[in-house]
């Protein structure tokens, strides 16, 4: 998930997905 982020023009889409997943994981992990 972290690899490649910020290198291609897909950073926006990747960051958006990563953020969503991170939030969901954080909620379940809490």
Swiss-Prot record:
GO molecular function: metal ion binding
Sorted UniProt keywords: Electron transport, Heme, Iron, Metal-binding, Periplasm, Sulfate respiration, Transport
Principal localisation: periplasm
Cell division in keyword set: no
GO-annotated biological processes: anaerobic respiration
PTM statement from Swiss-Prot or TrEMBL: Binds 4 heme groups per subunit.
Annotated compartments: Periplasm
A Gene Ontology term for the protein's cellular component: periplasmic space
Assembly and oligomerization: Monomer.
Protein's job: Participates in sulfate respiration coupled with phosphorylation by transferring electrons from the enzyme dehydrogenase to ferredoxin.
Name used for this protein in its record: Cytochrome c3, 50 kDa
Lineage start: Bacteria, Pseudomonadati, Thermodesulfobacteriota, Desulfuromonadia, Desulfuromonadales
């Amino acid at each position: 998930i972290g690899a490649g982020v910020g290198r291609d023009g897909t950073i926006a889409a990747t960051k958006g997905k990563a953020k969503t997943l991170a939030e969901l994981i954080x909620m379940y992990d809490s």
